[in-house]
Swiss-Prot record:
Keywords, in A-Z order: Chloroplast, Photosynthesis, Plastid, Transit peptide
Classification via InterPro entries: Haem_Oase, Haem_Oase-like, Haem_Oase-like_multi-hlx, Haem_Oase_decyc_pln
Subcellular location: Plastid, Chloroplast
Protein's UniProt name: Probable inactive heme oxygenase 2, chloroplastic
Transit peptide (first-last residue): 1-47
GO molecular function list: heme oxygenase (decyclizing) activity
Organism: Oryza sativa subsp. japonica
Low complexity composition-biased segments: 1-13, 56-69
GO BP term (any one): photosynthesis
SUPFAM superfamilies given in the database record: Heme oxygenase-like
Function: Probable inactive heme oxygenase that may play a role in the regulation of phytochrome assembly and photomorphogenesis.
Family: Belongs to the heme oxygenase family.
Chain residue ranges for the region called Disordered: 1-27, 50-82, 107-156
Length: 330
């Protein structure tokens, strides 16, 4: 009986289920990181999102405004003005200065190589010509007398033996100074012009000895010659291009206007005697051409400022030479 009761009781009570597995809790930091990551992603997406397209009407208005705007004009390119004779060399530029001094009232000249007309005043820069304008006007007559073919000697000049000897004395001082500087200077620029064949100092000495043998007194150099010689000496030490401008123009003036003056003086007061001052051992035109070519080649290495200074000094050279020539009639 008791056994039967126990069996019945066991059949009525169900068995207990097994306990559930234990739950594992995730750390709080993982949950926080997940939230932060989601927030940053949302911010990034919001910041990089493309802006909404503009309305079609606004886009068309902008396109029409762009089409109606005038095109920008290109800025004009400025080229420096070329001086008359600049393509040939500084000696050619100085020739235009001489022509301007010889013909102060003329406004245009014809270029020999191109046939194009150029203003004579263009041969000197504004800086070079402005400071010399008044002096050039005062000494135009002097420059004309010395520069070309002795124009105006007939009927205007009354040369004297005493005045001509003074002219030779001052000329000798100028040529002595120039030739001494070129021969003794250590400046490389002057070396090219040594023994050019144009030298005049020794020949003038022979002429002055002849005048002394004729009983004619040979005076000391005048103020005009001494002033110019001093100026040349100082200039040679400070600026080679400026000095070479005087060097070339002194010989240029003598081989052109100087020879013409000598011929007329010889006929008037020397009974046709030809002086040594006007003689050369070879063709003087070739000698002057060789000197001119050397100067042009050397001037290729000069700045425009140096060339303008040469043009300014060329005008001064003709002024000084004009004062010396006037000694003939004083």
């Amino acid at each position: 009986m008791p056994l039967a009761a126990a069996v019945a009781a066991s059949a009525v009570v169900p068995p207990r289920p097994p306990p559930p597995p234990p739950r594992r809790a995730r750390p709080l930091r993982s949950f926080t990181g997940l939230i932060l990551t989601r927030d940053l992603a949302a911010l990034t997406v919001a910041r990089c999102a493309p802006s909404p397209p503009a309305p079609a009407a606004e886009a068309e208005a902008e396109a029409v405004a762009v089409d109606e705007a005038p095109p920008a004009k290109p800025r004009p390119r400025r080229y420096p003005r070329q001086y008359p004779g600049e393509a040939v060399g500084v000696a050619e530029e100085m020739r235009f200065v001489a022509m301007r001094l010889r013909n102060p009232k003329r406004t245009t000249l014809k270029m020999d190589d191109t046939g194009a007309e150029e203003e004579v005043g263009d041969g000197v820069s504004e800086d070079a010509s402005a400071s010399e304008e008044e002096e050039e006007e005062e000494d135009d007559d002097d420059v004309v007398e010395e520069e070309e073919e002795g124009a105006g000697l007939e009927g205007e000049w009354m040369p004297s033996m005493e005045g001509f000897v003074k002219y030779l004395v001052d000329s000798k001082l100028v040529f002595d100074t120039v030739e001494r500087i070129v021969a003794e200077s250590t400046d490389v620029a002057y070396v090219y012009f040594r023994k050019s064949g144009l030298e005049r100092s020794a020949r003038i000495t022979k002429d002055l000895e002849w005048f002394g043998g004729q009983g004619i007194a040979v005076p000391e150099p005048s103020t005009a010659g001494s002033t110019y010689a001093t100026y040349l000496t100082e200039l040679a030490e400070s600026n080679a291009p400026a000095f070479l401008s005087h060097y070339y123009n002194i010989y240029f003036a003598h081989t052109t206007g100087g020879v013409a003056i000598g011929n007329k003086i010889s006929k008037k007061i020397l009974e046709g005697r030809e002086l040594e001052f006007y003689k050369w051992d070879s063709d003087v035109e070739l000698l002057l051409k060789d000197t001119r070519e050397k100067l042009n080649e050397l001037s290729k290495h000069w700045s425009r400022k140096d060339r303008n200074l040469c043009l300014k000094e060329a005008a001064k050279c003709f002024q000084h030479l004009g004062r010396i020539v006037r000694l003939i009639i004083l």
